[in-house]
From Swiss-Prot:
Taxonomic placement: Bacteria, Bacillati, Bacillota, Bacilli, Lactobacillales
Domain of life: Bacteria
GO (cellular component) term, any one: cytoplasm
One Pfam family this sequence matches: PCRF
Protein name per its UniProtKB record: Peptide chain release factor 2
Family per similarity comment: Belongs to the prokaryotic/mitochondrial release factor family.
Length: 365
């Protein structure tokens, strides 16, 4: 990398970091951190442990923003100093170090830009992702299991705790439905753009004639609501059924009815949890899913009213295809909203979907 190229990169990075400083309002950020630390130092702070944990989480999030900004700014200043020294006197080892630092700084800035883009009210929350294959039989159900693998690998690679809440086996292969919980900060923010219909085109391994098939699978994503958002669910409105449950692939089938299915009678929403070992645990998880769905339903209604006033007729529905995965006659994964695409389809199916997530966050600004 030539010094002139490094200089141009650092000038661009400097503009971005200055922009971060303006948007963050560092003085206000420091004041907010100080106020939270003062609250945490009070003798009665731990009297309400749930409230205390929220304060700690908020403090950690603000400190992370502040510390990450300072780290980028310090790295930029160090790189600029090294560039000045190299312009005065060549040093091969120092230039290699500067190239590595410039690359690392660019990566830090890109990550920080994404953090700033996660600014929606529920982006910081855990996420529940559901996969529902379409009407393509075994081929569609197998496609659902491929997407499950893709998302679980992505979550594990990014340090999220990944938990299967409910899993229903397919008739021959794959799955009929699955609910996956992603635990970690910003899980919902990263995954919310995955909501929609995912289309697969391939030569079906289940077709003896080796014909090309097109399958569709719907993905839904909801924030897992915390205690700061109250959703009232009347006991009289909920019908509970219990049944024997087993793990993915039909393993460890329980001899007692630990699986729980909840039906919200007024809306017809049905949720179920099967993976906990106890009926009580499954009921709690199913109720949390139901509350998230009811809250999402209310938010969708409000958004529909806004869209109607604006004359915006677009909506998330079964017909809203967001991404195509073509295995034959060529290999290509393309997002129909952002235009982002890649031919590295095997990497995508192994969970490397950051390019699509990042493109959606920028497109949705």
């Amino acid at each position: 990398m030539e010094l002139s190229e490094i200089r141009n990169l650092l000038e661009g990075y400097s503009e971005k970091i200055n922009g971060f400083r303006d948007s963050l309002d560092l003085d206000r950020l420091e004041e907010e951190i100080a106020l939270l630390e003062n609250d945490m130092a009070q003798p009665e702070f731990w009297n309400d442990q749930a409230a205390a944990q929220k304060v700690i989480d908020e403090s950690n999030a603000l400190k992370a923003k502040y510390d990450n900004y300072q780290a980028m700014n310090n790295m930029l200043e160090e790189a600029q100093t090294m560039l000045e020294m190299l312009q005065e006197e060549a040093d091969e080892d120092m230039q290699v170090e500067l190239e590595e630092m410039t690359t690392a700084l660019g990566q830090k800035i890109e990550s920080y830009e994404l953090e700033i883009m996660l600014n929606q009210p529920y982006d910081h929350m855990n996420a529940v992702l559901e996969i529902h294959p379409g009407s393509g039989g075994t081929e569609s159900q197998d496609w659902g299991s491929m997407l499950m693998r893709m998302y679980t690998r992505w979550g594990e690679a990014h340090g999220f705790k990944v938990e299967i809440l409910d899993y229903q086996d397919g008739d021959v292969a794959g799955l009929k439905s699955v609910a996956i919980r992603f635990v970690g900060r910003n899980a919902y923010g990263f995954l919310r753009g995955e909501k929609g219909v995912h289309r697969l085109v391939r030569i079906s391994p289940f077709d003896s004639a080796n014909r090309r098939h097109t399958s569709f699978t719907s993905v839904d994503v909801m924030p897992e609501l915390d205690d700061s958002i109250e959703v009232e669910v009347r006991d009289a409105d909920v019908k509970m059924d219990t049944f024997r449950s087993g793990g993915a692939g039909g393993q460890n089938v329980n001899k007692v009815s630990t699986g729980v299915r909840l039906t919200h009678v007024p809306t017809g929403i049905v949720v179920q949890s099967t993976m906990d070992r106890t009926q009580y645990g499954n009921r709690d998880k199913a109720m949390a899913m139901l509350k998230s769905k009811l809250y999402q339903l209310e938010m969708d209604k409000k958004q529909a009213e806004v869209d109607e006033l604006r004359g915006d007729q677009s909506e998330i529905s079964w017909g809203s295809q967001i991404r195509s995965y073509v295995f034959m006659p060529y290999q290509l994964v393309k997002d129909t909203r952002t235009g982002y695409e890649t031919g590295q389809i095997s990497n995508v199916m192994d969970g490397e979907i950051d390019g699509f997530i990042n493109a959606y966050l920028r497109w949705n600004l």
